[in-house]
Amino acid sequence: ALVFLAGCSNTKYLEEGELLYIGAKAKVADSAMSRKDRKALEDELEGLARPKPNSKILGMRPKLWAYNIAGEPKKERGLRHWLRNKVGEEPVLFSQVDLEYNANVLESYVENRGYFKAKVSADSTRRGKKAFAEYTLKPGPRYHIREVEFPADSSALGEAVARANRRTLLKPGAPYDLEVIKTERERIDSRLKRRGYYYFNPDYILVQVDSTVGKNQVDLKVKIKAETPAQARIAYTIADIVVYPNFSIKTDTINYKPEDVKQHGDFTIIDSSKLFKPRIFDRILQFQRGDVYNRNDHNLSLQRLINMGTFQFVKNEFRISDSLSTALDAFYYLTPLPRKSLRFEVLGKTNSANFTGSELSINWSNRNFFRGAELFTTSLFGGIEVQVSGRNKGFNVYRIGNETSLTWPRFITPIRI
């Protein structure tokens, strides 16, 4: 009976004139398109239509049913409130559907896929107290890429973008697709970030589309937007590298004495507590003074700092150097975890040999044992197990021991390509 109600009685709760919205159906009217491609495109279009109808399981809408049978709860707790607000789902009405808006969304979507002459019409069908939307797409011909140009200007940035054409995702003969163009912009941005362009972003790349070349083809021209700010046009190098290994997140200011500052190679270490040996940062931080900024080195340095297991918070900033406008100062603000910790554990256990017992362990750890981010742990444990049945009932097993380990941080050196 409950299954029948969940599947069939939801519409009886609707007000006069209300219709339950049960979804969208899309039809692609193009005999030249393969059946498989038509079906795939129809599924994509149906997924874009809004709002979504009430969820279904095996053809039924149990969440809507739970919402309806709960009624309006009189208080903000209890079974009715839980059913209606936690389990239930408010009915999606056909009056919430904007057919014209959805048609425009679907039309824009297929245009972005290269169907520049696409037209979408919308209609609806009513069945009793239910209704669904119908969208018909006449896609027209799909435009394909004829040629791709990366014109270089005289600037270093323009030349860097032009050199990115060797691995472009925009291929002559491929269908026009806005998503591929967006991915290409991100690819170029990623390439530039590895070559010093810290302030660049994909929005500064313009892909001009010329659809007037005929034969349902387009020409693409990839270039830098004229309004790209000056900072984004600079390939930065690394100047000062400053590390604060004992940074407190509880304060916005950093106070230190001259004797707290230690110069270690290219790194300036400011550590009033002398928590760490400066040489540990040689293996972790990938930048050196004079290096061209590289996003891969940036991310790898942060990843290694986090994976050390020594710091609770890791924060990194790059700022334009006061001494050179084409260089960046790198700052690393590191908040250590408590150096020492003590943990107690009590375990209860049983096994198939009818032994039952418990174990107590005391674990002590030091996350910076020799001031080189080494992890020293020692555990003292003891326990007893008693056989509660069987031939050796009452037989006791005692266990006591100690485990000690010392782990040094190790990093695999990346292969530069």
Locate the predicted segments by residue.
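C-terminal motif of bacterial Sec signal peptides marking the signal peptidase cleavage site
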Residues: 4-7
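Interaction-mediating elements
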Residues: 9-307, 316, 327
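Gram-negative/organellar outer-membrane beta-barrel architecture
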Residues: 157, 274, 294-417
